[in-house]
Amino acid sequence: MEKLWGGRFQGKSEAWIDDFGASISFDQKMAKEDLAGSLAHVAMLSKCGIIPASEAAEITAGLKILQEKLALGELEFSTVNEDIHLNIEKLLHEEIGPVAGKLHTARSRNDQVATDMHLYLKQAVAEIIQSLKHLRVVLVQKAEANVETIMPGYTHLQHAQPISFAHHLLAYFGMFTRDLERLEESVKRIDISPLGSAALAGTTFPIDRAYSAELLGFSAVYENSLDGVSDRDFIIEFLSNSSILMMHLSRFCEELILWTSHEFQFVELTDAFSTGSSIMPQKKNPDMAELIRGKTGRVYGNLFGMLTVLKGLPLAYNKDLQEDKEGMFDTLETVQTCLDIFAGMIETMKINTEIMEESTQKDFSNATELADYLAKKGVPFREAHEIVGKLVLECTQNGIYLQDVALSHYQEINPLIDDDIYVVLSSKTAVQKRNSYGGTGFDQIKVALENAKKTL
């Protein structure tokens, strides 16, 4: 089959080489965007008098037929035609004849593919943004139901201080809010039209780039044609934002995996988000959380791969840029699916509130409360820290906790300690009193929830 660019070539291509160079197996995902870009381009060609209105009408009608066939799944693509652009042009030629050749006037595949990618990513990021917004709603709802659910707060995966489970959830709400802000802010760099940049230097035809951009819903055009066809920053930025988002999902999934274990039993995932074992009949594994954790590395790999492809590329287009699509497509699909799965897990998981709170009563996470108590009585904090540290050591040697120490012994340690110490040492009191701004105190959490709701 003749190549659409075959004029200067004499030798015939070989199928196995065609297959290696072809991208149609994956860039056909952008067929809808390619057709939209062509419709805008032909409308602009007609408006500017570059092709007759009658020919523009023929081309437009042909493109709309292809749109209908695409929607019905009736378009067939071939590796002989390399990519989505040449496949569409070939199919258009079959529909309307030689006039189809005028569609590519004042256009290169270089600005064509860039336009397709901008259009595709803009729509896909909008969908991810909606899923991320839904996740934030789920987190707020779950936090609202668990303001007074007490759990251990950790540092170094060791019990540190008791906190509200809602406080823990709202910490992730903050992370996902930043993810949302990054994605929303990045849209303005995706929402730019490269169409009309042609191969790299613009065109001699009197085109109207602003008009085609407007038809496609872009808010701006690239000011430099060379930049327009060479820029893949918008993809790298998306991959970077996605990597940070996946990292946040992965951190939470790691905690869910721990919390569902027999050693913790803080939460229970529903059967829908769990799997069993082929040999051990008792198993209920948090596979979906593990998969999200695993797929995070996959998204990182797509980012590193894209950075490496671009690292040594001179301007403008190079065939290396064919490698910019699969990682983008894969990341879009991975992030979208992971967000939906994760939101479902959080929304439906059961919180074992009693086990959570009990775990704060069999530890020394209330040690800071005793140190603060002494400091409020006038003991220098460093001295109070030393006193409590020695008492914790004594307790561990005797197999008891701070709340088990007799008042008489407390008063031997420091006569300033009174019987109110036992209220101070309770987990609920420890949490309730931490009402500094942004703290885990119940009043602060209620303020945080109200603030969070305003951003939903």
Curated annotation (Swiss-Prot):
- Record InterPro entries: Arg_succ_lyase_C (IPR029419), Argininosuccinate_lyase (IPR009049), Fumarase/histidase_N (IPR024083), Fumarate_lyase_CS (IPR020557), Fumarate_lyase_fam (IPR000362), Fumarate_lyase_N (IPR022761), L-Aspartase-like (IPR008948)
What name is this protein filed under? Argininosuccinate lyase
Listed Gene3D superfamilies: Fumarase/aspartase (C-terminal domain), Fumarase/aspartase (Central domain), Fumarase/aspartase (N-terminal domain)
Against Pfam families, the record matches this protein to: ASL_C2 (PF14698), Lyase_1 (PF00206)
Q: Which reaction does it catalyse?
A: 2-(N(omega)-L-arginino)succinate = fumarate + L-arginine
Biological process, per Gene Ontology: arginine biosynthetic process via ornithine; L-arginine biosynthetic process
GO MF annotation, one:
argininosuccinate lyase activity
Organism field: Listeria monocytogenes serotype 4b (strain F2365)
Lineage top rank: taxon: Bacteria
**GO CC terms on record?**
cytosol
**Family assignment?**
Belongs to the lyase 1 family. Argininosuccinate lyase subfamily.
In short, the EC number is 4.3.2.1
Gene responsible for this protein:
argH
What keywords tag this UniProt record?
Amino-acid biosynthesis, Arginine biosynthesis, Cytoplasm, Lyase
- Listed as disulfide-bonded, the cysteine pairs are none
Q: In which pathway does it act?
A: Amino-acid biosynthesis; L-arginine biosynthesis; L-arginine from L-ornithine and carbamoyl phosphate: step 3/3
The record lists the lineage as: Bacteria, Bacillati, Bacillota, Bacilli, Bacillales
Subcellular location per the Swiss-Prot or TrEMBL entry: Cytoplasm
Which HAMAP family does this one have?
A: Arg_succ_lyase
